[in-house]
């Protein structure tokens, strides 16, 4: 892959506490989210505890607000928080780079979620080049009532489809470095869109709604189905958010 990644002000909350008894106890506010080794938070914490032979146990509570299976790296962000939290809690002294090397074993997006900010991601997503902050803008996020797995997104990926808009990554990098918001937006694209939108037309409806209500551009995030719209004005974004809520196309 080759893509630009950017953190936004949307987050889950992970609370971590030591306990005398060995083992990891993970709880969450979402009933269908697993709380064993299938959960990336559990997997990340266990990896560090096994490596450093930590005898104490952990109690972790995960309050999820980022939608599940939404193409927003929510699970990867949670795993990154577990790496950072366990490192601090037990005073392991691992640097950010050392955490990132371990994080890729849990998931391709996890090293970026440890680093955060604006970055060019290559390889499977683990080769990261830090970039200057994206030019200041407002981002509206809407998730329709469907879930799309990464596996489904890749199964429906047709790179030779004329409808596929290939992003100009080099042009985006230059625009970001120059603080050129319009230049960045004009070079954006998501190759997953045609395959996913053909299965879930509501994604296109959300894009159209955002763009007809002031977004410079609306696009699917990652493998979808979440859509984000970029605005240069908060009032425009707030009005678009109200219209989106009324439409009930997305949350």
Describe each PLM feature range:
Residues 248-251:
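Conserved short beta-strand edge segments in small beta-sheet-based binding/regulatory domains
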């Amino acid at each position: 892959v080759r893509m630009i990644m950017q953190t936004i002000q949307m987050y889950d909350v992970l609370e971590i506490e030591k306990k005398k008894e060995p083992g990891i106890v993970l709880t969450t506010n979402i009933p269908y989210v697993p709380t064993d080794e299938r959960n990336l938070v559990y997997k990340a914490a266990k990896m560090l505890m096994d490596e450093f032979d930590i005898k104490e146990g952990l109690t972790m509570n995960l309050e999820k607000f980022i939608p599940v299976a939404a193409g927003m790296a929510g699970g990867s962000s949670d795993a990154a928080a577990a790496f950072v939290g366990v490192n601090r809690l037990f005073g392991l002294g691992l640097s950010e780079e050392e955490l990132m090397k371990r994080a890729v074993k849990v998931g391709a997006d996890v090293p970026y979620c440890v680093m955060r900010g604006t970055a060019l991601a290559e390889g499977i997503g683990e080769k990261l080049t830090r970039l200057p902050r994206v030019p200041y803008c407002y981002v509206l996020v809407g998730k329709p009532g469907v879930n799309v797995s990464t596996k489904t997104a890749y199964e429906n990926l047709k790179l030779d489809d004329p409808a596929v808009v290939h992003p100009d990554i080099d042009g985006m990098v230059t625009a970001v470095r120059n603080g050129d918001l319009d230049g960045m937006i004009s070079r954006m694209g998501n190759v997953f869109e045609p395959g996913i939108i053909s299965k879930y037309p509501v994604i296109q409806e959300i894009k159209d709604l955002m763009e007809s209500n002031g977004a410079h551009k609306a696009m699917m995030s990652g493998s979808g189905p979440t859509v984000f719209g970029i605005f240069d004005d908060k009032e425009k974004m707030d009005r678009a958010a109200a219209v989106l809520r009324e439409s009930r196309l997305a949350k």
